[in-house]
Amino acid sequence: MPKFYCDYCDTYLTHDSPSVRKTHCSGRKHKENVKDYYQKWMEEQAQSLIDKTTAAFQQGKIPPTPFSAPPPGGAMIPPPPSIPGPPRPGMMPAPHMGGPPMMPMMGPPPPGMMPVGPAPGMRPPMGGHMPMMPGPPMMRPPSRPMMVPTRPGMTRPDR
């Protein structure tokens, strides 16, 4: 009877049947071996790419990046518009420049104060309602009369 060999685990299974292979492949040790195998393979691929890039750069096949040396003749390359900086000649300053600064990030509220809005990274509650004012919650009237326990046979406890 042929045996099944697992390359990841470097072992033979008792026999070659789908149920034995399925049981083996769902095992903890097999999964760890597969993960380790591919992790080592990725590290080897990354190191190979680094080595090839380094060799090509040293041979002069890859030119140095344009930002690695100062521009010739004092020429200045303007930064992309997405990078904030001082306004360039002939440009209007952005609305946030020259005016009052935006509200800075604040730390946690003092004890007893409730923050307004959801915590950073949190979604608002399901209804989308946000608290209006910090402080204790407001009581709202019940939507229907409160249920008063009654004794069997009594329809109205106040009569």
From Swiss-Prot:
PROSITE patterns: ZF_MATRIN (PS50171). InterPro entries: Matrin/U1-C_Znf_C2H2 (IPR000690), Matrin/U1-like-C_Znf_C2H2 (IPR003604), U1-CZ_Znf_C2H2 (IPR013085), U1_snRNP-C (IPR017340), Znf_C2H2_sf (IPR036236). Belongs to the U1 small nuclear ribonucleoprotein C family. Residues 62-94, 140-159 are annotated as: Disordered. This is U1 small nuclear ribonucleoprotein C. Keywords: Metal-binding, Nucleus, Ribonucleoprotein, RNA-binding, Zinc, Zinc-finger. The lineage of its organism: Eukaryota, Metazoa, Chordata, Craniata, Vertebrata. GO terms for biological process: mRNA 5'-splice site recognition; spliceosomal snRNP assembly. Component of the U1 snRNP. The U1 snRNP is composed of the U1 snRNA and the 7 core Sm proteins SNRPB, SNRPD1, SNRPD2, SNRPD3, SNRPE, SNRPF and SNRPG that assemble in a heptameric protein ring on the Sm site of the small nuclear RNA to form the core snRNP, and at least 3 U1 snRNP-specific proteins SNRNP70/U1-70K, SNRPA/U1-A and SNRPC/U1-C. SNRPC/U1-C interacts with U1 snRNA and the 5' splice-site region of the pre-mRNA. Component of the spliceosomal U1 snRNP, which is essential for recognition of the pre-mRNA 5' splice-site and the subsequent assembly of the spliceosome. SNRPC/U1-C is directly involved in initial 5' splice-site recognition for both constitutive and regulated alternative splicing. The interaction with the 5' splice-site seems to precede base-pairing between the pre-mRNA and the U1 snRNA. Stimulates commitment or early (E) complex formation by stabilizing the base pairing of the 5' end of the U1 snRNA and the 5' splice-site region. Its main location: nucleus. SMART domains: ZnF_U1. A zinc finger (Matrin-type) spans 4-36. It comes from the Eukaryota. GO terms for cellular component: Cajal body; commitment complex; U1 snRNP; U2-type prespliceosome. One of its GO terms (molecular function) is U1 snRNA binding. The keyword Disulfide bond does not apply.
